[in-house]
Each structure stands twice: as structure tokens, then as C-alpha cells.
Amino acid sequence: AKSYGASSEVEVFDSYPVLTNSVEETEFAKALALEVFGEEGVLESISPMNASEDFAFMLQQRPGCYFLLGNGEKGGKGSCMVHNPGYDFNDDIISTGATLFARLVETHCR
């Protein structure tokens, strides 16, 4: 801002809760993901992320499971995380992702 002759103030709010998945819903989502993607398509352990996520507020009220849906192969289309200027959504995963989400809803509603 200063280089353009303006000023700015930054306030940092440390108010996001830790996002913690409930065990039962995580196992439910994992089982269906394994049906849809197979063992080779499901990563069970990733490094913890230091980011804020609004879904954490929802998980304070109801049990649930936040998961990531892969978007591409390393170095290929869709390999950047969202909120990155190099991000390019991989349209090829739309039907696969929709299949998983539909299966989650369908199975939950039985």
C-alpha cells in the first residue's frame, strides 16, 4: 500500500476452531470412497494442514467428515491446491467426485 501512497492496517483474528472429523462419519466416508476409487485411489494419511476452514464451525455442531478430493497428478493438470494462482480445475474429475458425493448421500439416507 505504501508504494502507492496509501496506508493500511492489518488485524489478525485467531478465532477459527481446530477442524476435527468424527470417527464414525470418517469411517463411513472412507468405506464409500474405497468402493468408488479402490485402495489405490484413497490416501488415508496426509500431513496436517495449518489453514483455517469454515467447515470446522459446522463440525462443532454436528458430527461429520471433511475430506479432500484429489484434482490431478503431481506436476500435471490440477496439481496445485486451490487458492493458488496456478490452480487449474481438472474437469475430468467432475463425474468421479459427483459419484462419491451422490453415494454418500444415497447411502446415508437409506
Language-model features and meaning:
Residues A1-R110:
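Metal-dependent amide/peptide-bond hydrolase catalytic core
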